[in-house]
Amino acid sequence: MQFNPIIIGVAGGSASGKTSVAQAILQRVGADRIAHIDHDRYYKDLSHLPLEERARFNFDHPDALDNDLLVAHLDALCAGQAVDLPTYDYATYVRLPYTERIEPRPVILVEGILIFYEPVLRRRMHIKLFVDTDADLRFIRRLRRDIAERGRSVESVIEQYLATVRPMHLEFVEPTKRYADVIFPGGGRNPIAIDMVVARIEAALQSMA
């Protein structure tokens, strides 16, 4: 059975404010009507590598993500089937044995830095949003987040930013801005843009009713 949900993509650089935009949409549209998927859950398992090598892995390259699994999950949700989202441990760089089940909803909201890079993902999205934030602000946010939430040291965050995060953003993330239907300037704190997106979602949902 085809469920035909509306698929929304929220992209942007690391720590750009994607989650803030996603949460604003969830609050306005209603979490009971949205299946929320974070692309970060789909990082490939690195348990076969020594810990030091895992720490040097390029997580900002498209090949770091299991997009085949994400596509399979999107297609399953569109077919009215529940899916089990993977859980990733950012401290040890491995996929954990437990999952989180989500049920089909009228709206699927996917967020991640690279969700517009892969054509196979882009083609499935009805509304594409890009959160555009200054690089210095993104770095400060990332530094605070990785220290507080992921147990990282200041030195390791800076090293990773210079080695992979910044160059991969310029090569793979920034160019995908051209695919966006709406660009959120200033880190996503744009209530007018949120109003426009929510109105578009509500209109689409009414047309499906």
Curated annotation (Swiss-Prot):
It catalyses: uridine + ATP = UMP + ADP + H(+); cytidine + ATP = CMP + ADP + H(+). The keyword Nucleotide-binding applies. Keywords: ATP-binding, Cytoplasm, Kinase, Nucleotide-binding, Transferase. Transmembrane segments: none annotated. The gene is udk. This is Uridine kinase. Its EC number is 2.7.1.48. The keyword Transmembrane helix does not apply. It is an enzyme of class 2 (transferase). Pathway: Pyrimidine metabolism; CTP biosynthesis via salvage pathway; CTP from cytidine: step 1/3; Pyrimidine metabolism; UMP biosynthesis via salvage pathway; UMP from uridine: step 1/1. One of its GO terms (biological process) is UMP salvage. It comes from Chloroflexus aggregans (strain MD-66 / DSM 9485). Belongs to the uridine kinase family. Its main location: cytoplasm. GO terms for molecular function: ATP binding; cytidine kinase activity; uridine kinase activity. InterPro entries: P-loop_NTPase (IPR027417), PRK/URK (IPR006083), Uridine_kinase (IPR026008), Uridine_kinase-like (IPR000764). GO terms for cellular component: cytoplasm. ATP binds at residues 12-19. It is found in: Cytoplasm.
